[in-house]
Amino acid sequence: MQGGDYPDVVHLATGREAALTEQFIKGNLIADITDVLSMTVPGESKKVSEKIAGGFTDTSLTNPYGDGKTYLAPMFYSPCGLFYNAGFLKEKGWDVPTTWDEMWELGDKAAAEGTYLFTYPTTGYFDAFFYALMYAAGGPDFFDKATHYEEGIWDTAEAQTCFDIVTKLASYTNPITPAQANDQDFTQNQQLVLDNKALFMPNGTWIVGEMGEAPRADGFEWGMTALPAVKAGGDQYSYTWFEQAWIPAGAEHLDAAKQFVAYLYSDEACKLFAESGAIQPVLGIADDLDGDNKMFYSIYDNGAKAAMGNFASFTAIPGVEVRTVFFDPVNSLVSGSTTEQQWIDGIKSASDQMRANIIE
């Protein structure tokens, strides 16, 4: 691509370590696909906009410039949350926490029996976790201000609540986690839950297939819950993570590329994807699911609210990425080499730069 030879359609999500999609966003190198939403799905009578579930083309993940136009098509959605061994909790007689106070109580009970409360595959998995936490702490208004780096937002009570919860959770995390929290060894952290060496981990529905062949404790069965409410009676949130497909602005066959993107939402394509465990964000898709997936995709039917969106894009700043500023320091919080205040100070400093370079 550096030589100017672009594929017509790219399926590559944001949030990857190499941040290729983010580079294309920051460089304004992605084609506007707003008109695809009004196209008729090839071979069908419905328009693309009539098939995609509500809200999925109204977020900063699909409309990164805040100009009301869609540049990235939502693909393969997955409700994210805290995954656990439901069989182990049943065996112990422990209830799934619905508030963070209940979570800390459970952490103390588990510690007394030799099990840690928490682990995580890599710090990258804190994106969905932190987004849902921000919604739980302050609702959509706080989330929107925070993800646009509003001046003073990290000094608010809602922000402090988020920082305090993550820092406290770090103290309940299996200490081996940071050493394995990389792209080569992350499944070893996921294995901690299967072996009852940690109760909860943030993850997405793909975890079942990813760990399908892994050994597990007797009586293991997957469970998934939304993030606990900040206080009793508060809302619990589950972040909906989804991948993105997009068309490079330099694509040679732009019209054909748009037709192909429209086809990705056809019943035929959705069925093919679902056979591989990839679920398109189209209306009514959960009706056709069974087993673990039916449980996972019904999380919003069980009282959890959906959180969507992410940090606003900004022009390239050397050495500054959302993940390195907000999420990577969690490893150091767990190991004790970084304090909560150092983490917060880093976020404030970087947010000033991000705000100054935000892509409007």
Give the ranges of each region predicted by the language model:
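Hinge/lid segment of periplasmic solute-binding proteins
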Residues: E17-P79, W104
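Extracytoplasmic/periplasmic substrate-binding proteins
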Residues: E22-Q23, T115, F129-L133, A137, ...
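Mature extracytoplasmic/periplasmic domains
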Residues: D32, W206-E213, L227, K231, ...
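Extracytoplasmic/periplasmic solute-binding protein
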Residues: S60-M75, C80, W104-G152, N189, ...
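Glycine-centered hinge/linker elements that transmit conformational signals in sensory
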Residues: L106-A110, H148-A181
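C-terminal capping/gating helix-and-loop segments adjacent to ligand/active sites or protein-protein/ligand interfaces
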Residues: T147-H148, S238-Y239, I279-G284, S298-R355
